[in-house]
Swiss-Prot record:
Highest rank taxon of the organism: Bacteria
UniProt-listed GO biological process terms: protein secretion by the type II secretion system
Compartment list: Cell inner membrane
Similarity-based family: Belongs to the GSP F family.
Protein name (record): Protein transport protein HofC homolog
Major subcellular location class: membrane
Membrane topology of this protein: Multi-pass membrane protein
Regions that span the bilayer: 167-187, 214-234, 379-399
A GO cellular component entry from the record: plasma membrane
Originating species: Haemophilus influenzae (strain ATCC 51907 / DSM 11121 / KW20 / Rd)
Record key words, sorted: Cell inner membrane, Cell membrane, Membrane, Transmembrane, Transmembrane helix, Transport
Lineage per the UniProt record: Bacteria, Pseudomonadati, Pseudomonadota, Gammaproteobacteria, Pasteurellales
Amino acid sequence: MTKKLFYYQASNPLNQKQKGSIIADTKQQAHFQLISRGLTHIKLQQNWQFGAKPKNSEISELLNQLATLLQSAIPLKNSLQILQQNCTQIVLNEWLERLLQSIESGLAFSQAIEQQGKYLTQQEIQLIQVGEMTGKLAVVCKKIATHRSQSLALQRKLQKIMLYPSMVLGISLLLTLALLLFIVPQFAEMYSGNNAELPTITAILLSISNFLKQNIGILLFFVLSFFLFYYFYLKRQTWFYQKKNQLISITPIFGTIQKLSRLVNFSQSLQIMLQAGVPLNQALDSFLPRTQTWQTKKTLVNDIVLDKEVRSILQWVSQGYAFSNSVSSDLFPMEAQQMLQIGEQSGKLALMLEHIAENYQEKLNHQIDLLSQMLEPLMMVIIGSLIGIIMMGMYLPIFNMGSVIQ
């Protein structure tokens, strides 16, 4: 039975009003659960929430809460039960319930996660397995949550930077479209009575305006169809994702941000795994795509550069070469390679990876700040150019009125 989300209002044993949400199979079950908590005068209202996929922030928060409960010496099973009782995300709640059922059937926590899959990477599952074996599950969960939070913060920062330019560019395109549809035709009527030859830019603008007026419905249909095609099909295709990454990699600043982000994430993930006691070969292998038990399709390669680099490193390491000698400049710059070499020689590779991540995180932040400072004036130039071209094209015949009158 599909679970449902209910909002409730009730009174606690001290007759204080309580508000919140609860997930249950039926309204009666939700009512019974609230009574078991000691609540009375219960009012329930179902929220028709769709079963949306949990966000990365929700997964990070869940792992953070699990780490806190485990650090408080609460057993794993009880911790998961507490998390499920307080989880108001339907899909995540059902996932926790299946995890509990798998653990009750005798599976280890890491095995249960791998069986259910979906929300944790292979690296994170291996870390949890090591945490179980070493008795440091709480520490491992905390590190995974912290790493996820850092990655999410970077992603949100980039989204925030891109939001304003995207809105400005969208408004400028709408304004340009409005000028071509409503203002330019008025100039066309003004110039239609003259037999003089119009400037090239004016003639082009009048032709574009006339084309838009005659085909605006068809164009809107194709634009809407393209966005629907992109959202529901194109963005899910591996080849499109890879081509998009290749295009970003050759774009100034964006390519640098992509490369630094790849280096920081790889260094942080590898450092966490090595510190947890995962062997280097096994840690590197976790970066390669693999089909898990819950998957019915072949796992897709999200980052071709990283996949190629890790395969190359594994090949050289398996032949006896040092890790620092196996990496290339596509992933680690020369400075970082020297730091890796020092880390290997001193037996502190994990610590050196942490230093590399911190060092290049600063460079990544600098590039993001630089992008933020460049985008605003760039948008102003684009807007000014669009409107300026239209205005110049429309008023150029007036400036050349002498020849037009003749």
